[in-house]
Design a protein with these regions (language model features):
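Alpha-helical structural motif
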Residues: 14, 49, 96, 207-211
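Internal amphipathic alpha-helical repeat/solenoid segments
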Residues: 31-39
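C-terminal domain/tail detector
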Residues: 2-29, 47, 54-87, 217-244
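Short basic/hydrophobic patches in alpha-helices and adjacent helix-turn junctions
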Residues: 171-174, 178-181, 196, 213-221
Length: 244
C-alpha cells in the first residue's frame, strides 16, 4: 500500500524533504530487504520506521543534506540487506556484523560509540550494555540499525538523544508487530515481547504499558508522531488474549 510524503508530514510530523526523499526513492536492486518491492516505502513498520527515525535525527540537529547524502543512504540500504538475510537465517549474526563493520571501514565518525556498539551486539543474547539495549531482549532485535549512527557526525549530546529516541521508537514498532504476531510467534518459537512478559492479559497489559511510556518519550521530540502511535493503540486492543 502506498504512503505519501504528505501523509508522513500530516500524520507523523515527518519533515517533508525527508518524507519525499524516501517515498520517491527507487527500491535498490539486489537487496533482500526490498526484494520484490515496487515501492521504497510501504505500510509496514520496517519501512515506515526509516523516514520516521531519520526525521528524529533531523530534529536533534543533523542537517538534511548529511542525512540524505547518497553514500550514507547506500550504506544504510546495504545494512538492511544483511539484516534481513540474518533475520531469514540465511547468514549468521557474526557474518552480518562482520560484513557491516567492513562496510564501515574508513567511515566511522565516533570510535567510542562504534566499539561500544560492537561489544553490545556481540552478545549471544542482547542485554543492556553501556548506552545500548532495553531489559527485554526481544525488543533489541533490530539494534543492528544503530550502525547508521556510526556513519554520521553526531556530537556527544546527539548520540545520547539518538539512542534514547531509538529505544522509544523502534521497540514501539516491534511491540505492534509482536502483539499482532503473538499466536504465530508462540507456535513457531520466535522472539516476542509478550512471551517475555508473561503472556495472557497480564502480559498484554505490561506490553501496552511499555508502549505508552515510549509514546511519552517520543512526545518530547515529535508530539504529532506520539499522538499517531497513541491512536494506534486502539487497533492493538483486538489482540488482547482472553486467557493466559
Amino acid at each position: 500500500m502506498f504512503i505519501s510524503a504528505n501523509q508522513f508530514e500530516r500524520e507523523m510530523g515527518v519533515n517533508k524533504t525527508i518524507g519525499k526523499f524516501f517515498v520517491d526513492r527507487k527500491p535498490p536492486e539486489n537487496n533482500s530487504f526490498w526484494k520484490g518491492r515496487l515501492l521504497y516505502i510501504s505500510f509496514g513498520n520496517g519501512f515506515v520506521s526509516i523516514p520516521v527515525y531519520y526525521d528524529i535525527l533531523f530534529r536533534i540537529g543533523i542537517p538534511v543534506e548529511i542525512l540524505l547524502n547518497e553514500d550514507h543512504i547506500l550504506f544504510m540500504e546495504q545494512l538492511m540487506h544483511y539484516a534481513i538475510l540474518h533475520e531469514k537465517r540465511e547468514i549468521s549474526m557474526q557474518e552480518e556484523l562482520n560484513t557491516i563493520c567492513s562496510l564501515l571501514k574508513g567511515r566511522i565518525q565516533n570510535s567510542k560509540y562504534y566499539e561500544a556498539l560492537n561489544l553490545y551486539l556481540d552478545q549471544p543474547v542482547l542485554k543492556p550494555m553501556g548506552p545500548f539495549g532495553v531489559p527485554f531482549p526481544s525488543l533489541n532485535r533490530a539494534d543492528v540499525f544503530l550502525y547508521v549512527l556510526c556513519d554520521l557526525p553526531l556530537n556527544e549530546m546527539q548520540w545520547q538523544q539518538a539512542i534514547r529516541f531509538w529505544y522509544a521508537l523502534h521497540p514501539s514498532y516491534l511491540i505492534m508487530d509482536d502483539l499482532r504476531d503473538y499466536a504465530k510467534d508462540k507456535e513457531e518459537g520466535e522472539e516476542n515481547v509478550m512471551i517475555e512478559l508473561g503472556e495472557g492479559t497480564e502480559g498484554f497489559e505490561k506490553t501496552l504499558e511499555l508502549y505508552r511510556k515510549n509514546c511519552e518519550t517520543i512526545h518530547e521530540i515529535n508530539p504529532l508522531l506520539a499522538q499517531f502511535l497513541t491512536n494506534s493503540e486502539e487497533d492493538l486492543m483486538v489482540f488482547v488474549p482472553l486467557k493466559a
